[in-house]
């Protein structure tokens, strides 16, 4: 698991290789990731947008961005967390994602 805290909001990420949804002979690799966003502030925060850069070991690069995550813009109360699971297809067995969330203090 990887975690980072910025402005009182902690983001933790766990990744999982999805063997049943991958086909290495066709260079298709599926990964799931679980993200936990925890609010350490004394006020609520709302997740407005996401921005991800996805890279694989073949130097393929794509950007994923948009409003909220998995169809919602969650409001996270002080001391609470929001968790979701999503997935990513890669064309190689190695890759990385980096990015950020745009949050609003409420």
Question: Which residues fall in each region the model found?
Answer:
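Intrinsically disordered, low-complexity Pro/Gly/Ser/Thr-rich segments with frequent PxxP/GP/PP motifs
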Residues: 62-94
